[in-house]
Amino acid sequence: MGSRIKQNPETTFEVYVEVAYPRTGGTLSDPEVQRQFPEDYSDQEVLQTLTKFCFPFYVDSLTVSQVGQNFTFVLTDIDSKQRFGFCRLSSGAKSCFCILSYLPWFEVFYKLLNILADYTTKRQESQWNELLETLHRLPIPDPGVSVHLSVHSYFTVPDSRELPSIPENRNLTEYFVAVDVNNMLHLYASMLYERRILIICSKLSTLTACIHGSAAMLYPMYWQHVYIPVLPPHLLDYCCAPMPYLIGIHLSLMEKVRNMALDDVVILNVDTNTLETPFDDLQSLPNDVISSLKNRLKKVSTTTGDGVARAFLKAQAAFFGSYRNALKIEPEEPITFSEEAFVSHYRSGAMKQFLQNATQLQLFKQFIDGRLDLLNSGEGFSDVFEEEINMGEYAGSDKLYHQWLSTVRKGSGAILNTVKTKANPAMKTVYKFAKDHAKMGIKEVKNRLKQKDITENGCVSSAEDPLPKTMPSPQAETQDPRLREDRRPITVHFGQVRPPRPHVVRRPKSNITVEGRRTSVSSPEQPQPYRTLKESDSAEGDETESPEQLVREPWGPTPAPPDRAASIDLLEDVFSSLDVEAPLQPLGQAKSLEDLRAPKDLREQPGSFDYQRLDLCRSERGLSMAAALKLAHPYTKLWSLGQDDMAIPSKPSITSPEKPSALLGTSPALPLRPQNQEGILSPSIKEETPIPTPGSITIPRPQGRKTPELGIVPPPPTARPAKLQAAGGPLGDFSSEPLQMDRERQAALSPALLSGLLPRAVPQGPTELLQPPSPAPGAAGTGSDALLALLDPLNTAWSGSTIPSHPATPSAATPFIPQLSFPPTVTPTPFVQTPLNPFVPSVPVVPPSMPLSSTPARPFGTPPASLGPAYAPSILLSSSGFYAPHRSQPNLSALSMPNLFGQIPMGAHTSPLQPLGPPAVAPSRIRTLPLARSSARAAEAKQGLALRPGESPLLPPRPPQSLQPTPQPSVPTQARDPFEDLLRKTKQDVSPSPAPALAPASTSVEQLRRQWETFE
């Protein structure tokens, strides 16, 4: 290691002496030893040398009275190990107390010298002798251990492996106080170049402190040349030595030294704080290292601690820390050092020039030799210098260094055994450093990714923060624009800066949104997707669902947590008229057609779905947001029952038992699952029909909207209509009144009810699918032909036998007169109903007729002639919440497609739990989905005819509002012009005796014209 400190000395000190000048007459003779301990110490040469070093000045000079109390000199033994002579001068400098030891315990021995001097002055011989005996017999304690020699004398063993600190270290403290930063840097540079250095001071304590303190700043290197902290008068010729030296001279001896030929000597006068040097050593050092060192020294000039020593340590690491790159490691060979590799680490500049000179320095060679000896012997090393290299950027992460670490760990020679047996601190330090830096690197990467995610997405997507983050509200951002600026991303997509994200409700994982505030639940398994500019454009209004999220998220409805869903109303702030609370009821999963085609389901599951009143005041966005509540609302449950393809699949394997809810017209265009050639959907409808994920908010993109076709205007919200029932038995055959009430509460909304119209054997091929199936047992009253005709967009022939008839139930309820959109030619019944918008024009295009292959017998029987056209084939557009206007049908075999789907009237209701009349809500926005396409209506028609006899309703009934009358089925009538209703209404108002059934009391011509103009 190059250290000149002896390791593990035998005793704490070698000898204690009291030296004084004997007075013989009027002249002073040479100093003599007055007393010593131990008394049997026999090295007379050492004793004679001690007497001369105890008075390193001219005693008769004028500066003798100014000599300090304590100082230290150094003697070098035959092994080049240093022995420190700690001295204390008495008043007047007539006597000196000295302890000679191999241990550099400056503060400890200075304290002991004061105690011994006090004992001598007071003539306390017993205490004096006891203290010296105890100290001499004391085994060398470990660093940091407290030692109690007597009642009044104790000390703590200093640790030479630690950096010296201020003010604990006396030498560094006095050196830093006496010399300014610039002179310290110049002296440091001169020592690195191993110049001949003289330090002059009039105070011995300060002089020796500057010598010891400046030499300590070379750590982990040591001064390898002449080292004399204080030079006695008889050795002044050393100042003319040609080799490098570091010598301290008392000011009283400097006059004689000046008369010597001092060539190329650096002289530092501590008293005047001046430095004389013929060299330009400081400027030749790398400027960046010296600048950093100077700045650090200035910063710690007024602070305590090891800041000064650490500043020099960092400079040493910057200069020599790359020595690891020059270590050559060969298998079965000792580790060597390559000077060429050490110098070539830097290509050019002052650092390379300095390293070229450094390879010739004795202190550097001794340092490298000491490191190699420790490596090859397997002892290893661990000191603050290696830790500083590890913590700093001094080529500590190079490949050669890691190879060196691997060699040290795996073993090179005796290294492996040493690591296993001794667990040396060097390996612990290296391992701890690597482990700590790995942790720091991982944390830094996580923090950067987290910051990037916050900057780009405005939310955190990491597993460290699973709780929702509440973003600033629009009001807060309006008051403080910096909140909005902080969320602006810095990324650039396709050459354009992405605009600031608007205040939209982001779709969290929990689907719980609180009053316009954006919440985001982090998910490490499903991070937020990185959207391109095209996708981010749709985020201007609403968030969309990516196909990757559709694939990752499970199919099927997942109920929201009841405690959160019940307390949060998503649409309350958006739609003021919403008054529906989310019920806390368990939801069943959707069933596929294969599950419901079983005969046992046809016979054992009575009843039907109850179609609750749907608040049509909600816009498309409201409907889609309501569906995002994991289908906790009864309305959203009706949307989740497999209405996805609007057609019977030709392959049972395609139909999934858990289908995503199809919110028609409320999601972006995404690819559908494959359909066969005989699929009912047209290509245009297939492109426009999405498959969103249940429990997600899917809103159409602005660029995905299509212009509505001519004459296609979505109908407005209407009153709750009656359901189309498939009778469970012959006409007029009712088993009980509750059974009739259950049948009246059926909702033709789910394709799961199509099983009532399907036979036992499920048709597999496309040809068999279009064949009229035979009625299943227990479903004699089902309309198979009506179903197949509705599912065929090219079919225009409707047989009279396929018109389902409804039993006439005698009811004494108060007659309710709903509105009628297109009045039939025959005398209408007082129970027919019309939507609020009677002007939904349709293009009178008659597609080619495509009759069914066979027409079975009429399953419903012949309806009575007195029954009106109330039960013509009518469609309930369950997936959109709108009802098509009713069309009278005089000839079912030649019926045009727009007139195929008429208005469904009020059904036979005897339950007092069903609400009457239209909901008092605002009209919804105009949909952009072409709902009037015949194929789309045909696909939705299957839901209106699906009814199994005896099936119980899955949803609770509505609260009772009023009684509903039982509408009577009517005979088919002629189709009317859409504008004929307005003319007829006008005539009825002018006529003195208007028909009471056609002119409801709550409807006028002005209302019809106003509503017609609204949707024009």
Swiss-Prot record:
How does its record describe regulation of its activity?
The guanine nucleotide exchange factor (GEF) activity is autoinhibited. Autoinhibition may be the result of intramolecular interaction between the DENN domain and the C-terminus, which is disrupted upon phosphorylation. Activation is regulated by Akt activation.
Processing and modification events after translation:
Phosphorylated on serine and/or threonine in an Akt-dependent manner. Phosphorylation probably regulates the guanine nucleotide exchange factor (GEF) activity, possibly by disrupting an intramolecular interaction between the DENN domain and the C-terminus of the protein, thereby relieving the autoinhibition.
Protein's UniProt keywords contain Chloroplast: no
Residues found modified as Phosphoserine: S473, S520, S522, S523, S536, S538, S546, S592, S750
- Localisation: Cytoplasmic vesicle, Clathrin-coated vesicle membrane; Presynaptic cell membrane
Q: Please give the InterPro entries that the UniProt record associates with this protein.
A: cDENN_dom, dDENN_dom, DENN_C, DENND1A/B/C, Tripartite_DENN, uDENN_dom
Return the PROSITE patterns for the record: DENN
Q: Which spans does this entry mark as compositional bias, Basic residues?
A: 500-509
GO CC: one term? dendrite
Residues with the Omega-N-methylarginine modification: R760
Residue ranges annotated as motif FXDXF motif:
381-385
Some GO term, biological process aspect, for this entry: which one? endocytic recycling
Enumerate the spans annotated as cDENN domain.
Answer: 162-298
The answer, when asked if Magnesium is one of the entry's keywords, is no
* Membrane topology type: Peripheral membrane protein
Disulfide-bonded cysteine pairs: these are: none
Residue span of region Disordered: 453-565, 681-737, 763-783, 935-1016
Quote the biased-composition stretches of kind Pro residues, using this chain's numbering. 954-970
Q: What range(s) does the dDENN domain occupy?
A: 300-378
Q: Which residues carry this modification: Phosphothreonine?
A: T519
Q: Where is the composition biased (Basic and acidic residues)?
A: 479-489, 977-988, 1007-1016
Against SMART domains, the record matches this protein to:
dDENN, DENN, uDENN
- Purpose: Guanine nucleotide exchange factor (GEF) regulating clathrin-mediated endocytosis through RAB35 activation. Promotes the exchange of GDP to GTP, converting inactive GDP-bound RAB35 into its active GTP-bound form. Regulates clathrin-mediated endocytosis of synaptic vesicles and mediates exit from early endosomes. Binds phosphatidylinositol-phosphates (PtdInsPs), with some preference for PtdIns(3)P.
User: Could you give the subunit structure recorded for this chain?
Assistant: Interacts with RAB35. Interacts with clathrin and with the adapter protein complex 2, AP-2. Interacts with ITSN1 and SH3GL2. Interacts (when phosphorylated) with YWHAE.
Write the protein's name: DENN domain-containing protein 1A
The organism encoding this protein is Mus musculus
Organism classification? Eukaryota, Metazoa, Chordata, Craniata, Vertebrata
Gene of origin?
A: Dennd1a
